[in-house]
């Protein structure tokens, strides 16, 4: 698409996590679209690998995450202090060879598109330590300097001597402070510092843009809403229905279109506690499949399942829990569900709603924050704070086949507003302003 290819650096902060996050999905999709625009993609990781002078050992060590060095408690504390003191000097990133000698197909679905990989051991934590002491983002200095950095998350790092763009997905730590563990003072300090030093900000919805202006005080002309996109391979998206049905039954022992689905972290923001109460009260005749790793306050969110006695036993029989499934199987489970339930308290975008719509699965979601903007008229909207409303929504979704068919039809149309081509064009227009 572009006449003069450049190199754009993105961070691998969330990409290195073994279990997926929404920001990791964002970063992977971003890397693919940068490549499709015609630019080269460089990814900065912070693996604790052996940055040997031997290229082969450096490549092997980078991918051998289980063998990477992790200091003990006191060693880690001393190390963080030393790097905090050296903060103003910045950090050097070294190239990681990617020759193909290491077989990476095992985790191919977690890898971004990339042309180059850089690594600076523990760079993200070290930058946080330095920022606490100095109040300045640490400079990162790769040997082959990219032309621009697009950080996928607010972090105290900058690419020295080049434009720096930061994606701020939402203001949840400040909007709903009781739903996250973030140090709110440190978070606000970082956002305000980035407002003074960043070249530009990206966000993912008009709702989030308003929050950045109203809460963080960032000037609207310094924020571009690119929205997000989902890139689901055709082989998964177009898999025959009978094959989807067999895989759903074999993997989860569930019938095709005979279960409801939620996926996401088990944390207060996702509202899983009210969802479980509403689902159990609805007495619908299909099970609920919950996919998600237990996070902060998960015990509180899952207390209806963890209670003792007959009530807890009955609830556990109706709710199937899985901590994590790989992306290809997640796509199959979305396609096989009767409906997707996503009554989150607050979302900067709401990727699960878009993924479900793209796959033709009816969606029940919140009528708050960005979700009305993303789902439009293609979802059954409920008040996420009203358990009775969620309960009635579940009953309606399960009982009304005509409604499900209509939501599926509308969802496929609505999802096209966030097609990769549209997302790519918005990114291209943004990057042209800084390259």
PLM feature segments, named:
Residues 1-435:
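Carbohydrate transferase catalytic cores enriched for Leloir-type hexosyltransferases
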